[in-house]
Amino acid sequence: MNTYELEILEKLYFETFINQRILASSTGLSVGVVNRSLKQLAADGLIDKHGQLTEKGRQEIRQRAPRNAVILAAGFGMRMVPINLSTPKALIEVGGEPLIERTIRQLHEQGIRNITVVAGFMKESFEYLMDEYGVDLVINPDYASKNNLHSLALVADRISNTYIIPCDIWCARNPYSATEPYSWYMVSELVDEDSTVRVNRKRELVTISDKEAGNSMIGISYLTEPEAGIVRENLRRMDADEAFDEDFWEKALYARSASAASAASAAKVPGAHSHEARNGFKDRMILQAKVVSSSDFVEIDTYEQLRDLDSDSNHLKTDSIKAICSALNCKENEVTDISVLKKGMTNRSFLFSAKGAKYIMRIPGEGTDQLINRRQEADVYRAISGLGLCDDPVYINPENGYKITAFLDNVRTCDPDNLDDLRRCMDKLREFHSMHLTVDHTFDIFGQIDFYESLWDGNPSIYRDYRKTKENLLALRPYVESLPKDCCLTHIDAVPDNFLFYRPAGAAGAAAAASEAASAAQDLDQAQAGELLQLTDWEYAGMQDPHVDIAMFCIYSLYNRQQCDRLIDLYFDGKCEPVTRIKIYIYIAMCGLLWSNWCEYKRKLGLEFGEYSLRQYRYAKDFYRAAKELMEAEGQNA
């Protein structure tokens, strides 16, 4: 049967047949389509000569009826910042009711009580649903590294006469039903540039090119046989192939040719556009489109979308938004254009606009209170305030680490392989060090090495010779501490990513840039002329030998010994004393071990840093040997 025949069969399941025109009006089909469909239904024995359903016809409807639902609620909901810092997206309230509870209630209204919720991020928040609504909770432990195709694959065996529902959809009207005549995927009539499909005349969902706009994808779907079986098979096969780890579950709605290989998974979005056909995927979904009115469905994917739907939602009143309004003397509805910033190993930051300007709100990541003293950070910002080293924070809270800074347009970071960039960065670093600023706290390298090691909870290092490596560096400690130093406020995290080149807006900014450019090296590339330079991210700063900053720059850049020597020579203008070079070599080794220990701690939390972590440990060994060689050559004894 085709979908027209199934729609008519469902209509006759509930309503008595009167004539073709009334049936055409109630289904939205043409009289011609209705006539052809009625003839076929009669020929198949599904309706009698009076247009009433036979028992066979009723059985056909009953066997296609919904049996269960799966709600996908495992992801971070990254775009929901700052609400997602404390509440999973599925539990955001609209009209005082959590989104997922509204969905469950609407399913219950249609008699669907077999409901599975796939959770991951803040999974404990969903536990109450098991008692209150009798749902089955399935946990996706890989929610941070895999997309929702994996979530649905975990419950693939449950997909048969099943609604698949995203957790972030608010439905004004109940979209679920006690009967569903065929499989479908829901889209609206709204034209959406982010969509990957459009509805054709046959009500098929065909893929479109990147330059085209399609029908807005609501994301709700219904799967009955035979399509449910195809999706089950696709999910299992794709989930076993890591090439699909980042895919949305909608990828499983595309049939593949028999010769297609698993390498055909190059696309990373639903539908994945027309190139999938070339890679062995069909150019259309296996499901029919169910086109609905966009006014009845709202995807709540951002803070502002929630505010547009329910300006009184309790979840709009977050600590971070309150801090913004207080610091900038603005109202909640004046905070706009909120978007997440993914940069930063320890912070969860977001960009926003208010009163005609752009800002960044820094929200410290989970567990960073163990690693960073926010009161000390605030002391550092007070010490450097007004000195032109960085934009002064608009707001900083030493209790929770919240920080608001102005957003810089046209920014680039230092290229560690660009000699002009390196000259300017070392000039800036030397300028900062020459200020001889002070604070009341120090950055203790060996203290930090031991601190990160203590966070391993008694577990040994993953490196077999860790103890020997550490002992070697400890043996050099008395020597390096005996050397003369001019301790002052030191950045500690003076790495290429924290040197920001930018072009300021306005006449005053242009004048400042011109002044700084004039004082820079004469052979500065013309493309870089007019750029200002500042240092950012002062979280680790404290009193220390300023030459530690040179070491930190080297190890983050993954420099070899020759490149390290070049940077040292740039900082000292080619006049570095051998003893000072030895000292910096030792700092490179010590700081390498420090960040290696940091990486080991993060690894135990499930975070991997690839080559970076191994290279840090190599610095501890290689530059210990380099320092010893130079010490012997210079007649220095440890």
Predicted regions and their residues:
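Active-site activation/catalytic loop segments of kinase-like enzymes and analogous catalytic loops
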Residues: H547-C576, M590-L607
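Conserved core of the sugar-phosphate nucleotidyltransferase
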Residues: E7, A172-L253, S259, A267-H275
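ATP-binding pocket architecture of kinase catalytic cores
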Residues: V340-F446, P460-K468, S482
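ATP/Mg2+ or Mg2+-diphosphate-binding catalytic cores
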Residues: D310, H315-T318, N597-A638
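Conserved beta-loop-beta/alpha segment of the NTase-like Rossmann-fold superfamily
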Residues: F126-T196
